[in-house]
UniProtKB/Swiss-Prot annotation:
GO terms for molecular function: DNA binding; DNA-directed RNA polymerase activity; protein dimerization activity. InterPro entries: DNA-dir_RNA_pol_insert (IPR011262), DNA-dir_RNA_pol_RpoA/D/Rpb3 (IPR011263), DNA-dir_RpoA (IPR011773), RBP11-like (IPR036603), RNAP_asu_C (IPR011260), RNApol_insert_sf (IPR036643). GO terms for cellular component: cytoplasm; DNA-directed RNA polymerase complex. HAMAP family: RNApol_bact_RpoA (MF_00059). The gene is rpoA. Pfam families: RNA_pol_A_bac, RNA_pol_A_CTD, RNA_pol_L. Homodimer. The RNAP catalytic core consists of 2 alpha, 1 beta, 1 beta' and 1 omega subunit. When a sigma factor is associated with the core the holoenzyme is formed, which can initiate transcription. GO terms for biological process: DNA-templated transcription. It comes from Pseudoalteromonas translucida (strain TAC 125). Its EC number is 2.7.7.6. Keywords: DNA-directed RNA polymerase, Nucleotidyltransferase, Transcription, Transferase. The lineage of its organism: Bacteria, Pseudomonadati, Pseudomonadota, Gammaproteobacteria, Alteromonadales. Residues 1-235 are annotated as: Alpha N-terminal domain (alpha-NTD). This is DNA-directed RNA polymerase subunit alpha.
Length: 328
């Protein structure tokens, strides 16, 4: 392993130990000293707080007005039922939200498999217990809202001014959208040839079953890499301000020749030649103007002097004249 003293090692051994379908240990080595904690902490934070997923966000239970109620014939109180609903592991295909229904009666447990849903919804833990019915006459019916989101969103942050009109009995839940339920990492020493000061990163992660640990690590790494891309080439990524377009022509050229305040004789001669704007006039030469009926050298001298006082002259060339703004 010979290379430049400034060259960084890249991990070349990734070992994935699948403990069960939802839990894996992922080993990454060798890493430069200190990089184990740098990468481990960054990935851990992303996996816990920034992974997208689906979660129950609200529920309506027949006969229940608020979360501090108790329902006859049901072993759990409403708060316990809400906590159990938060444990549902759900995925949505092609939708951002769905409403699911659950209705059951008789003695026995009520599980996630009792929830009615279509093919766009997958429940990864169908044996998850929601509540237990205690008598033959017991029954429970509820409407469950599942949404797609990211990270952890408390119910209080979804309250709005319209909540005064929210139907009584619609209960909001704190939503944990991340499919990662538990993650821990440790850093051990690694050795490559004569170097013994390297790191080995070990990530122990468990998901809710909607996403396998290997894919979760892959997605978290992609998120981290995309966020760091901006630092690879430090540039101002803000939208450049639109520069104010300069006018194509000097505004004085767009003004009518009447603004030159010529004598009546000179002004009438120009009107007879359909010279309406100063931009029309400055493009004419002295020879062309002298051919105008009734316009003599005295009028020509007057026109030249008036134009000169405004920084203009005869015989000017104007590209793309007349502008579209003058078109009738």
């Amino acid at each position: 392993m010979q290379g430049s003293v400034t060259e960084f090692l890249k991990p070349r051994l990734v070992d994935i130990d699948a403990i069960n379908p939802t839990r894996s240990k992922i080993v990454l080595e060798p890493l430069e000293r200190g990089f184990g904690h740098t990468l481990g902490n960054a990935l851990r934070r992303i996996l816990l707080s920034s992974m997208p997923g689906c979660a129950v966000t609200e529920v309506e239970i027949d006969g229940v007005l608020h979360e501090y109620s108790a329902k006859e014939g049901v072993q759990e109180d409403i708060i316990e039922i809400l906590l159990n609903l938060k444990g549902l592991a759900v995925t949505l295909e092609g939708k951002d939200e769905v409403f699911l229904t659950l209705a059951k009666s008789g003695v026995g447990p009520v599980t996630a498999s009792d929830i009615q849903h279509d093919g766009d919804v997958t429940i990864a833990n169908p044996d998850h217990v929601i509540c237990n019915l205690t008598t033959n006459n017991s029954e429970i019916s509820m409407r469950i809202r599942v949404e797609r989101g990211r990270g952890y969103v408390p119910a209080s942050s979804r309250l709005s001014s319209d909540d005064d009109e929210r139907p009584i009995g619609r209960l909001l839940l704190d939503a944990s959208f991340s499919p990662v339920e538990r993650i821990a990492y440790s850093v051990e020493s690694a050795r490559v040839e004569q170097r013994t000061d390297l790191d080995k990163l070990i990530i122990d992660m468990e998901t809710n079953g909607t996403l396998d640990p290997e894919e979760a690590i892959r997605r978290a790494s992609t998120i981290l890499a995309e966020q760091l891309d901006a630092f690879v080439d430090l540039r101002d990524v803000t939208e450049p301000e639109e520069k104010e377009e300069k006018p194509e022509f000097d505004p004085i050229l767009l003004r009518p020749v009447d603004d030159l305040e010529l004598t009546v004789r000179s002004a009438n001669c120009l009107k007879a030649e359909q010279i309406q704007y100063i931009g029309d006039l400055v493009q004419r030469t002295e020879v062309e103007l002298l051919k105008t009926p009734n316009l003599g050298k005295k009028s020509l001298t007057e026109i030249k002097d008036v134009l000169a006082s405004r920084g203009l002259s005869l015989g000017m060339r104007l590209e793309n004249w007349p502008p579209a703004s003058l078109a009738e």
